[in-house]
Amino acid sequence: MTLSLNIKLYILSIGVLFVNASKAQEKQILNPKTTDYNILWIVADDLGTDLGCYGNDLVYTHNLDRLASESVLYKNLFTVTAVCSPSRSSFITGMYPVTIGVEQHRTRFKKQLPDSIKPITEYFKNAGYFVTNGQGNKGDKEAKMDYNFNAEFKDLYQAGHWNKRAKAQKFFSQVQLFYPHRPFQKDTANPIDPDLVKLPPYYPNHPLARKDWALYLETIQLVDVRVVKILKQLKEDGLLDKTIIFFFGDQGRPHVRAKQFMYDPGTNTPLMVRYPDGYKAGTISKELVSNIDIPAATLALAGIKKPSYMQGRNFLSEDHERAYVFTMRDRRDETVDRIRAVRSKKFKYIKNYYTDRPYTQYNNYKEMSYPMLPLMHVMFEEGKLNDAQRPFMDSYRPAEELYDLEKDPFEINNLTETPEHELELEKLRSVLNKWVQKNDLGVYPENQIEINAAQNKASERHKKTLKKRKLPQNATYWQLVEYWENELLKK
């Protein structure tokens, strides 16, 4: 027997949804003329911190680098999960996906949000803003929502572009950029030499891996081209100096051991906030920010009171400083899993609930889309992976992981068995356990009908993809590697 979402929410600590009204108001650092400013979110899809302004000296992102120089740049924005639909459901509500029952990706039988929870678009419309979600062109074309709850575009948004508003009406707009989501695209204007790319040590130094990485960076460069067009349009419309701009990603890199997982490359994404008056332009913040904090800050900039239930915090306020960010993994398409993690500035603790399943339990999207995944399967079977690469491909995963992010930024050396880190392990284990008890609906198993629907859909996609690629239905990893080598290295 499955419990209804509202009953589950009651069983959870309801206190998380209704913050004590007597809590002191956050003091705002910035006090803009909120009645004069529009607000724009530019959201990239699957974007890691692989930009020039974040230290990558190979990628050509001069427009985003210029935007960063005019913005406050945040180094430590982490998404609550590393896949699009739960992440997007969170940053449109300011809530953890596991608190409001939107944690699974994707859900075939979507439900309404709990009665008390509203997308922030509702608060902006009630405040008189014109609310849009588009692709940044004046054609008014609607853009991706990808929310894991029942939501019609017309109920949340009034148009695809801000130019449809009444004269002088303020707007809260989103522009969705598909890139650098797979499939990657070539940037013929600024191609990247695969021999020059710097791969993380947990990837094999193989021509196929380097080519895939180079194409990822080239696709990021196309994001850069798209962003400058949006900024140019704002300027031509006389709106650039009247609009607060947020630029961020819905999660991190679309790569092995990144997207869908709790390591930093999957959850760490750029965040820039540009103010019309040049407030703190060119400054860098290393404070921890969760992407559920973005809607809270956005409401504050508009002078709209944050609803008491919202878990996100206004990271623009002086008294905001997160000690931790929390991230989570649940079912991803047909792949059932449960991982929770807590991160401080120095350490990360990961709890794996399904230790009987490998990290790489089958997922059709990744197996068919990531050239590096079948490559690493093959190299694992042939004994060609090193100590940094092998653990993620193994049939075993530990119940707990602990990483010193200052000494080990690639999260390779698990410290759970080292006596000198026992106190840190106990502390973060306790922090995460308390957070789970207070916030996490994922303790309740998902309806099997939903899981079956996801698995059937994945099976259909698997068959269609192999047929399109003219591969047998029982194609081996060796055959998939050969396919990708023909596609990426020989054309």
Regions found by a protein language model. Name each.
Residues 430-434, 450-451:
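Loop/helix patches that line or flank the sugar-binding groove of alpha-linked glycan CAZymes
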Residues 8-18:
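Bacterial N-terminal signal peptides
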Residues 436, 443-444:
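A short N-terminal helical cap/helix-turn-helix that marks the beginning
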Residues 2-3, 22-400, 409-430, 444, ...:
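Formylglycine-dependent sulfatase
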Residues 406:
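C-terminal helical cap and adjacent loop that interface with cofactors, partners, or active-site loops
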Residues 1-9:
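Positively charged n-region of N-terminal signal peptides that target proteins for export
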Residues 445-458:
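Short, charged, surface-exposed hinge/linker loops at domain edges
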